[in-house]
């Protein structure tokens, strides 16, 4: 992928909360050095990850970029970070005021018939793409505008975990769905994860 405004925005929006969380853990890391190395790894990881379209064409680019950011911090910590610490870092980042506000702002438009049609159109375009980093999904319309089902058959975060040799961390990234849907006023019923 190219390093675009999406990647810059994600770094500004969620990296500070991640580093604040890690600083509070008192694990003896030099947070300043960790930030610098993480940013370098982040840029490298972005450049070696296949493009899935712009943030406007494919909103899931934000999810993929978030995954890249968190895995880059994990790698910068020389993989000495425990899975529990990684999970806490991801959660703390997602709970940053900017992220919560962004998802709550979508609450009025996320569960409408127009949003369902848009998701279905995006899903059909993604399904045609053979890129393993693309989310392939099937949208099933519900009884009304507020209810729908999305069945994912392929996940960009799973592909990212495999690419970086860190598939064991992908389930912690799946928690993002539950938090974000909750902030938009919905309820997510996950029957399984692809990871």
What do these predicted ranges mean?
Residues 1-74:
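N-terminal, charged low-complexity regulatory/assembly segments
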Residues 3, 34, 135-139, 188-191:
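Generic structural motif
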Residues 28-30, 82-84, 167, 187:
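Short coil/loop linkers at secondary-structure junctions
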């Amino acid at each position: 992928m190219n390093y675009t405004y999406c990647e810059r925005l994600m770094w500004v929006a969620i990296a500070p909360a991640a580093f604040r969380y890690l600083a509070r853990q008192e694990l003896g890391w030099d947070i300043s050095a960790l930030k610098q190395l993480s940013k370098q790894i982040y840029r490298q990881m972005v450049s070696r990850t296949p493009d899935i379209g712009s943030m406007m064409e494919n909103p899931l680019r934000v999810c993929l970029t978030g995954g890249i950011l968190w895995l880059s911090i994990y790698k910068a910590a020389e993989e000495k970070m425990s899975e529990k610490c990684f999970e806490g870092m991801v959660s703390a980042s997602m709970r940053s005021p900017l992220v919560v506000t962004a998802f709550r702002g979508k609450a009025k438009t996320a569960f409408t018939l127009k949003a369902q049609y848009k998701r279905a159109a995006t899903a059909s375009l993604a399904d045609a793409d053979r890129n393993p980093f693309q989310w392939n999904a099937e949208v099933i319309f519900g009884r009304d505008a507020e209810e729908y089902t999305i069945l994912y058959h392929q996940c960009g975060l799973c592909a990212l975990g495999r690419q970086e040799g860190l598939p064991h961390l992908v389930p912690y990234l799946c928690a993002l769905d539950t938090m974000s849907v909750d902030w938009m006023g919905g309820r997510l019923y996950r029957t399984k994860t692809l990871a």
